[in-house]
Amino acid sequence: MREKSFQCNESGKAFNCSSLLKKCQIIHLGEKKYKCDICGKVFNQKRYLAYHHRCHTGEKPYKCNQCGKTFSYKSSLVIHKAIHTGEKPHKCNECGKVFNQKAYLASHHRLHTGEKPYKCEECDKVFSR
């Protein structure tokens, strides 16, 4: 195994080749050189552009082996699988209610805080979700 002699000054991560170090540094610089030819959105890594492109193509390469539902992103499939297992790892510190998704907990938490971050552009009314 090669020694990791290339270290990023920003993140502290070490790499065994200079090309990986350069990729890490590009992330910190915010350089965005990969542009979507459909909507113009730009990304700092080619793989993020490829992931984004799925929203235009509708590609969903990740399939749940229990129900057949498909997803564009692996992370979405992982979150979905909690539905089948019944796992609810996200617990409200205020009332103890549990949720299978972090986003559902965040939405629920706004009931306790009264936060209403969503605003209707038509009538300016605000909502918690």
UniProtKB/Swiss-Prot annotation:
Q: Name one GO cellular component term.
A: nucleus
- Give the highest taxon in the source lineage: Eukaryota
Primary location class: nucleus
Location(s) in or outside the cell: Nucleus
**Keyword Phosphoprotein listed:** no
Q: What does this protein do?
A: May be involved in transcriptional regulation.
Its recorded name reads: Putative zinc finger protein 702
Q: Which organism is it from?
A: Homo sapiens (Human)
